Amino acid sequence: MKYFVIALALAVALVCIAESTAYEVNEELENELDDLDDAAWLAVAEELQGLEDFEESRGLFGKLIKKFGRKAISYAVKKARGKN
């Protein structure tokens, strides 16, 4: 009976350890997923900034589009930072 109690206590201890580390791993995975989402968003933003290099963006309205794009990006950055 004594060995059964010791084995049960060890099993409970192992389950407690496994449960406590599982949440940390899940939180780390969620943080990494958020980081990947941010990196993907930044990559798309960089691609959009590079549109002025394409031949399609050059033309009669190219300068207006660039000017509007820069103003829109700076406005979005100011709003994101809370500077109104």
Swiss-Prot record:
Pfam families: Latarcin (PF10279). Keywords: Antibiotic, Antimicrobial, Cytolysis, Fungicide, Hemolysis, Secreted, Signal, Toxin. GO terms for molecular function: toxin activity. GO terms for cellular component: extracellular region. Cleavage of the propeptide depends on the processing quadruplet motif (XXXR, with at least one of X being E). Belongs to the cationic peptide 03 (latarcin) family. 02 subfamily. The mature peptide (59-84) forms alpha-helices which probably disrupt target cell membranes. This is M-zodatoxin-Lt2b. Disulfide bonds: none annotated. It comes from Lachesana tarabaevi. It is found in: Secreted. InterPro entries: Latarcin_precursor. Has antimicrobial activity against both Gram-positive and Gram-negative bacteria, and yeasts. Also has a strong hemolytic activity against rabbit erythrocytes. Causes paralysis, but is not lethal when injected into insect (M.domestica) larvae. A motif (Processing quadruplet motif) lies at residues 55-58. Residues 1-22 form the signal peptide. Residues 23-58 form a propeptide. Expressed by the venom gland. GO terms for biological process: defense response to bacterium; defense response to fungus; killing of cells of another organism. Coiled coil: none annotated.
